[in-house]
Design a protein with these regions (language model features):
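Tryptophan-centric aromatic hotspots in well-structured domains and transmembrane helices
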Residues: 15, 20, 31, 36-39, ...
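Conserved active-site alpha-helix within GNAT-family acetyltransferase domains
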Residues: 23-34, 105, 114
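Short beta-strand micro-motifs in enzyme catalytic cores
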Residues: 14, 47-48, 69-71, 103-105
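N-terminal beta-strand motif that seeds the catalytic metal site of vicinal oxygen chelate
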Residues: 1-29, 69-71
């Protein structure tokens, strides 16, 4: 473990995904770059990631984007965590699916907040 690549920990906030729909992806990148000096890595035309303190990214694909920022937790065992979410009263709204870099699922907590959990 080094300062650049800290060890991931199950159940800890790991990633923040924010919507960038309606043609705002380039404007958001320009804004955060200009205002805060952020840099970005593009993963195709609809996703751009940042690593500025807490890693995160902007989702421009309306079919994939949440309406609000999406906190993303990390899990070493995605299926076990999905069962724990359901057993605790959460509702899975997107079952486990693959994406570049891993797999994840989305859930809604009892207050209606959507979050996701991912694993490598």
């Amino acid at each position: 473990m080094n300062k650049q690549t800290p060890m991931k920990s199950s159940g800890k906030l790991d990633y923040l995904e924010m919507p960038a729909t309606g043609g705002t992806l380039d404007r958001l990148k320009a804004f955060y770059s200009g205002a805060f000096g952020w840099s970005f890595t593009d993963y195709g035309p609809t996703y751009s990631a940042f690593a500025e303190g807490l890693d995160g990214g902007f989702q421009a694909d309306a079919a994939e984007a949440s309406a609000k920022p999406l906190p993303v937790l990390y899990s070493r065992d995605l299926e076990e965590t999905l069962r724990a979410v359901e057993n605790a009263g959460g509702t899975v709204v997107k079952p486990i699916f693959a994406f570049p870099g891993g797999s994840r699922f989305h859930f809604v907590d009892p207050a209606g907040n959507e979050m996701a959990v991912w694993s490598e």
